[in-house]
Amino acid sequence: MALLLPEFDPADVRAGRDLIHRLTADAAGIQRGVLREILSRNSGTEYLRRFLGGAAGDDDDVRDAFKRRVPVSGYEDVKPYVDRVASGGEPSSALLCSDPITCLSRSSGTSGGQQKLLPSTAEELDRKVFFYAVQALVRNMSLHTDHGEDDDGGGGEGMYLMFAFHGDRTLSGLPIQSALTTYYHSRQFQECDIGGFDKCTSPLEAILCPYGEQSMYCQLLCGLLHRCRVDRVGASFAAGLVRGIKFLENHWEEMCFNIRSGQLSDWITHTPLRDAVTGQYLQGSNPALADEIASECARKPWDGIVRRLWPRARYIRTIVTGSMSQYIPILEVYGGGLPLVSPIYASTECAAGINLRPLDPPSHVSYALLPNIAYFEFLEVMDENGEKVQGTTRLDDNLGEVKVVDLVDVKVGRCYELIVTTFAGLYRYRVGDLFTVSGFYNATPLFHFSGRHDVILSIDYEKISEEDLLNAIAETDKFHLRPLGYMLVGSTAYADISTLPGHYILFWELTNTCDSNVAIDIDQTAMEKCCLAVEDHFDEMYRKIRHRGSISALEIRILSHGAFDALMDFFVSRGTSASQYKTPTAIRSKEAMMVLEERVVGRFFSQATPSCRSAEFERR
């Protein structure tokens, strides 16, 4: 265990550089060791015995047997075992992994549309500690270099929004909750500086508060009270940070009253939270600070509000890759030029990706998968020419003889789907996340997160990937919305087949950049141009089908203020963790669509068909 998860001090930058070099220079050797350790521990489990029997021999023999006999799997392969673990009728250590399963981690369900319960063990918390320690090390190496080689940058604090909510329990008493909630409640997290190797303005009682609105209010209030100490601002995901800023916009006057009077609002009723805020932060009236904050918040628009409220802030730290990329423009406005740092790639299956060049612009962010966290394989999805590899387009595909390659054998420019084998009992498991290889750091590949396999829009033969949709929206936002003074706050899509032919619907919430108010009175011609611009960015197959009339015109529906907050509340009410929530790029649930439909204030359609080369050829 110590060899795979070496202890180190994230504040010791010199030693940290050596650690990262060792991890990335010998990725192949470390990966062999990880697989050897996983198989030696778990070969007696029911799942592996089905395929490996009593496979023995040297490392190469066992590795070859693993690759030949253990099939690539998906959630439906694992679910029967998870159900048996949940029922508690037999020892969990006999089913998937030799260590007792201590928790079932619940995925958000907003990426692929399906919530999943995945096994986790006590040891997984140690891996998370190592993972976040490496993240802190990279931060100290790249973002706080002026503090010196052996200084932890301790002069500043992070104003991070973090939330842990109580989950459910299985019949056998196992907790069911998000991976982040498990981590925040753990001894490992609470024994570190609050924030996990990261001094944070939020008291632990705010992070663990079960009431989301009270938690959000007090975390922002504490961040304002410590505004002169804050040198970084963030949240796990960009959607959560934008939500926090909009919350602040609606509550800053009340917070200023709290600061001016030294009294916390009566509606903060959670006793541990109230005691922590009044005992540690709000210890008397401070009219001068209240006036400073009010002066900045009263200025409209809110361009640069993060930099203005936290003048020492060096950067914004939040995940802005994948579906979160839609929030880059609005965060750039709120940040007023602060760099957007997308620090990690993490999924419920495993947290493993570190951004080793955190100051790269968001569009160029790449992650290195730490080779000691899990065993990684990759299923090729596209070659370097952008051509799809047959048989790998859906999670339920029969892979046949399609080749799966190891971490160090991927090729630059090619797109792959991530497959993981974990200590906690996932074997050759398809995560559903797509990565394009952008280069190498020593012997370890760097991956650009390209989206998900199973988040697509499709009505006829066309298939719109998450990346296709996000790129189309980003270009339309850049060239059609922002020049008119509009800013996209939230977006999701829905394939509507309630009428024939079906069509795509984009739900957008906009603000006016001049005063930060909700944009409702919008020019019809401008929005019709946006509809066509999105369609023009879709692929040739979509445009061909549009010309044939098998899909009707794309529609944009403009939403009232708070619509995407309501969508989050809908998903949270159905078990999604608020801390892991990501606004879905596309929704499939009719119920979720109706949450947005109730808040529609404008409807616009393409008034022309998108350009199509093949249609022009057919007319000739």
Swiss-Prot record:
Its induction note reads:
At low level by auxin.
Q: Which InterPro entries does the record match to this protein?
A: GH3 (IPR004993), GH3_C (IPR055378), GH3_M (IPR055377)
Expression across tissues is:
Ubiquitous.
Task: Please tell me which top-level EC class this enzyme sits in.
Answer: ligase
Q: Which domain of life is it from?
A: Eukaryota
**GO terms under biological process:** response to auxin; response to light stimulus
Q: Name one Pfam family in it.
A: GH3_C
Would the keyword Ligase turn up in this protein's UniProt record?
yes
Protein function: May catalyze the synthesis of indole-3-acetic acid (IAA)-amino acid conjugates, providing a mechanism for the plant to cope with the presence of excess auxin.
**Family in the record:** Belongs to the IAA-amido conjugating enzyme family.
Name under which the protein is recorded: Probable indole-3-acetic acid-amido synthetase GH3.7
Taxonomy of origin reads: Eukaryota, Viridiplantae, Streptophyta, Embryophyta, Tracheophyta
